[in-house]
Amino acid sequence: MLSRRKFIKACLGAAGITAFGGLSLRAWAGGAGERTDAPGAAAVPQNGLADRPRYLGLEESGELERRERALWAKMESCDLCPRRCGVNRMAGRMGACSSDQTFIVASAGPHFGEERPLVGRHGSGTIFFSNCNLLCIFCQNYQIAHHGAGRQLTHAQLADIMLTLQRRGCHNINLVTPTHITPHIITALRLAIAQGLNTPMLYNTSGYETLEVMRLLDGVIDIYLPDFKYQDSALAARFSQGAPDYTLHTAAAIKEMHRQVGTLRQVGGVAYRGLLIRHLVLPENLAGTDVFARWVVSELGADTHVNIMGQYSPRFRAREFPPLDRRPTQAEIVQARRWAEAAGLRNFH
């Protein structure tokens, strides 16, 4: 099984233009798309879900089109994320996320290194978008988030990727780092729906979101997969390119996600709706794991699914910021899990 870092490395093996699992971004960049008769392209029927994706009803009612227009309007004086740059990205200006009116895909393919309920037998249909609105100095995927590796695609090509992942039997469409390009995603989603997309949408985010955008995604997203990185605003300001309001906005956004989709729900061990929170253990408890665990139980409930991740590695500029210049010790990771247990979390791993 590939870890996320190895998955990224495999995807970037050809300068960010060949996606893992045989999905070639070079083909989409040239407009060819992926062959529907490619090996492994036979779909695993999605009708085994307990509920069909709610975005289908939004499209049928015309509400999804209204949400799409509202999100595109935000690009004209960009406030898609809490940084609220106010730049007119539709006129080609770059926001803090290093994105204008276009979008870049770094890689796409079935991913088997995500959490087990997201992977199932056929993988999570992962689409890595380039650039980021948070820009952590210890970013584990800095080639994508900071350096913008990948290919600029069209909405039709993105829709084609979604449909190809569905044909390959992926259990969800996993949108990685989607915050700064949500209008593009909704436009592509509507194109894909018209061609038969009916796979759950998974929103894989740093957590640095606004309530306005989260509410526009209500009913569009089936599974939320946010990070909650810090409990100390001063650390967020230091380590995430001046985002002292990270903790405030992320807490509010995650509570809204939980309101929308609730606790993670599964059929046959595969998630089809709900919230799963990621929390990366940092050296010397810089992530505030004890505070985080108590917050989850208090605000969301003890049954909330949480991944306490111990794989931190000092990457990108982390060595300039001790103690982020080292991995957490085994004792620190064990202590983090003890805090989760002591807080009363019942679904953490």
Enumerate the language-model features and the residues they cover:
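Conserved Radical SAM active-site core
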Residues: S98-G219, I223, S233
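Generic structural signal for well-ordered alpha-helices
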Residues: M162, I186-L189, M214, I254, ...
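Hydrophobic faces of well-ordered beta-strands that scaffold small-molecule active sites
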Residues: I173, M201-Y203, Y224-P226, L275-I277, ...
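Conserved strand-turn element in the central/C-terminal portion of the radical SAM core barrel
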Residues: F239-A243, A253-G288, F292-A293, Q311-Y312, ...
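Conserved radical SAM core fold
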Residues: A145, T182, G207-T210, F228-T247, ...
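N-terminal [4Fe-4S]-dependent radical SAM core
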Residues: G48-C78, P82-F128, Q143
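Non-cysteine beta-strand/loop elements that form the S-adenosyl-L-methionine
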Residues: D218-D232, H305-Q311
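N-terminal secretory signal peptides and thylakoid transit peptides that target proteins
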Residues: M1-G16
